[in-house]
Amino acid sequence: MKILDKNKPIFYVGDHHGNWGQLFWFTDRLKIENCYLISVGDSGIGFKPQKEQLIDIKQLNKKFKKHDIIFMSIRGNHDDPSYYNGTDRIELSNFETIEDYTVMEHNGKLIQFIGGATSIDRSMRKEGVSYWSGEGLNFNGDKLQKVDTLITHTAPTWCFPQRFNKMVYDWAKDDGYLLEELTLEREVMGEIFKVCQPSLHLYGHFHDSWNEEVNGCKHRLLNINEIWTAFE
């Protein structure tokens, strides 16, 4: 288990879809430094050819190091899963991708990270270029454990949004299994919560901002580029 530096606070950021310039604009504006910045997914990693992508990541690592920020990210549905596990996982001094079910400790509290979600517009995307068949939530009950904080990309059924919007139904017209898979994915998240029992949960994916306490857990949905810390 990785133990994070207790002297560095953790900031969390919502989906930014590879718009690193805008992300740095926000970190500069908020004077964020000497910290961990953890993305709840959709960092846009994998949309470029591998050689170009790795060059970009090395440059980003240098920039985060200059800002004294250690950036880490779980995978979203708009990330190539291969960069998040195995030998291709990114682990540089100031830039790291987090494998599903990883547990870290910060100031005595346990944090578990579980990425993945289903793209509602997958029917118009190109496999291996802008869509990856392994994008969804992968359930592994053996790796779950009780933690204080749970970081995911999608969320259980009781979290916002509780209903499908018109956009989802429109995409479902060209994707016969979409509604079924979206429903199952969120139900599986509910099973994950039964084991993890976190008191704090952060997620992204839905491009909105929401927070509410449900069954003793504070849930917070981070909007695009929204940055939040428990110490604000």
Regions found by a protein language model. Give the residues of each.
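Flexible loop residues that form catalytic
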Residues: 42, 155, 206
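Proline-aspartate-enriched helix->loop->beta-strand connector
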Residues: 147, 151-152, 169, 189-203
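Active-site-proximal beta-strand elements of phosphoester/diester hydrolases
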Residues: 7-17, 108-117, 148-153, 218-223
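Conserved catalytic scaffold of divalent metal-dependent phosphoesterases
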Residues: 45, 72-177
